[in-house]
Amino acid sequence: MKQTKYIFVTGGVLSSLGKGIAAASIATLLKNSGLKVSILKADPYINVDPGTMSPFEHGEVFVTDDGAETDLDLGHYERFLDESLSQDNNFTTGRVYQSVIEKERRGEYLGKTIQVIPHIVGEIKDRIKKAGEGKDILIVEIGGTVGDIEGLPFLEAIRALRLEVGKNNAMNIHLTLVPFIKAAGELKTKPTQHSVGELRRIGISPDMIICRSEKALDRDLKDKIAISCGVEKNCVIESVDAASIYQIPLNFLKQDILSPIAEILDLKNLKPNMENWDSLVKRVIAPSNEVKIAFVGKYVDLKESYKSLTEAIIHAGAALDTKVELKWVDSEKLENMESSEVFKDVSGILVAGGFGYRGVEGKIKAIQYARENKIPFLGICLGMQLALVEFARNVLKLKDANSSEFNEKCQNPVVYLIDEFMDTNGEKQIRTAKTPLGGTMRLGAYKCDIKEKSLLAKVYNEVKSVKERHRHRYEANPKYRADFEKHGLIVSGESKGLIEAVELNCHPFFLAVQFHPEFTSRLEHVNPVICSFIKAAINYEDN
């Protein structure tokens, strides 16, 4: 069997430098050169997965087709690679220890003392190898920063794995910061030198260094980094701040990043076709038109919480040659503001998902304003649930209508806890209010049957069903379906009795979906729900 080649990506100096974007950009170039490529993110934190972590703590939780709750970098990987990944493409320290302890309890280690080396490191290596099966190249991003104590087993694993697979089958890329000191008026390389020194003390010598900076590096500075860090001169690549993350693969290509990669990994004919990508990026950066959308959410102070959704909107803008300006609206603050003043200058209102009661009434106000004023509206996940609550209160006149998530004793729970459903493997899942939170939601891609001649059918080009990804614990209560439909709120999508989408039949564009369309949107293949909403907003502005 052909040996998979590995590219290990580490980061130094500080976090949030963009290792995920760099890894995804290299993967894009390799894939467009005709290679079978995949990416894995190894996260050193102790949580089993990010599913129960606060958006303020971790940012978005990205969900794969098979229902894995993963790091937001997997979203970048999918959007750049234009491929669906799985739970094999992300694991944490918590997951590794959980697996090793379970094996120990089953007696699989035959009574041996369980240690970080070889058992924990061995488990990490096994997971990396599994993710690379059947691929020409596996890119492995190690989360965190070199020097973090929790990352040591992961660095030991990639050090050992490189020795195991041999020369020309693995390489190390290190991403560092080259800060610009305004007072001195120059870029400083010392943090990079120290970071590489720290990496070497662990036993890893980088083959390539990618330098994050707000300004371009001149040739002398690159040569200085190459000499002091022991890499070839053509292996010092700059990653300067860009107008769009989708420029990064093109910027890397201009610096001929593939030549040293090809030489180190013994690869031939790396000539990526990036024409379509380049065309779309130009429309992202310099579109012909512009439209403004209100983005209503409770985590608007941390935009990373909605990463996939904001990227999907960029994809739609590129497809429609339009810059989509987002007006961020804090749903909690909206509760005490005048809707007409907040939404007077927008051509569409998007109500995003979320958890917990804070900011809910503000979202309901936004939905009511969109419905009554015929402004294009899209509700996602909680946005759909609250569209039902708003309609029940203001049209059906059920003033105490609510979700049982926010009021367990309400008399009209138009949204309630899903107590029984079939998971993505076809197995029955039973839930109660006391079920532990971790990994117990309705997660992953489920088939949605679409009502003929509906707005949703038009959005999806008249197909009978689609598969979209979910992440929710509560669901529309079918007990109220007849009343909703009698008054014009139509169920246009469902999945084995669960309501997946609703729409208003007397509104230019009022669509709410239980699933997350943003999780399947890519630059080269935008999700139809997001694209149709932006198109409706453009039409609203034109008219």
Curated annotation (Swiss-Prot):
Residues 1-267 are annotated as: Amidoligase domain. ATP binds at S16, L17, G18, K19, G20, I21, D73. The keyword Ribonucleoprotein does not apply. The keyword Magnesium applies. Residues 292-543 form the Glutamine amidotransferase type-1 domain. L-glutamine binds at G354, L382, G383, M384, Q385, E405, R473. One of its GO terms (cellular component) is cytosol. Its EC number is 6.3.4.2. Mg(2+) binds at D73, E141. Keywords: ATP-binding, Glutamine amidotransferase, Ligase, Magnesium, Metal-binding, Nucleotide-binding, Pyrimidine biosynthesis. PROSITE patterns: GATASE_TYPE_1. Allosterically activated by GTP, when glutamine is the substrate; GTP has no effect on the reaction when ammonia is the substrate. The allosteric effector GTP functions by stabilizing the protein conformation that binds the tetrahedral intermediate(s) formed during glutamine hydrolysis. Inhibited by the product CTP, via allosteric rather than competitive inhibition. The active site is at C381 (nucleophile), H516, E518. GO terms for molecular function: ATP binding; CTP synthase activity; glutaminase activity; identical protein binding; metal ion binding. UTP binds at S15, K188, T189, K190, P191, T192, Q193, K224. GO terms for biological process: 'de novo' CTP biosynthetic process; pyrimidine nucleobase biosynthetic process. CTP binds at S15, D148, I149, E150, K188, T189, K190, P191, T192, Q193, K224. Catalyzes the ATP-dependent amination of UTP to CTP with either L-glutamine or ammonia as the source of nitrogen. Regulates intracellular CTP levels through interactions with the four ribonucleotide triphosphates. Belongs to the CTP synthase family. PANTHER family: CTP SYNTHASE, CTP SYNTHASE-RELATED. CTPSs have evolved a hybrid strategy for distinguishing between UTP and CTP. The overlapping regions of the product feedback inhibitory and substrate sites recognize a common feature in both compounds, the triphosphate moiety. To differentiate isosteric substrate and product pyrimidine rings, an additional pocket far from the expected kinase/ligase catalytic site, specifically recognizes the cytosine and ribose portions of the product inhibitor. Homotetramer. This is CTP synthase. It comes from Campylobacter jejuni (strain RM1221).
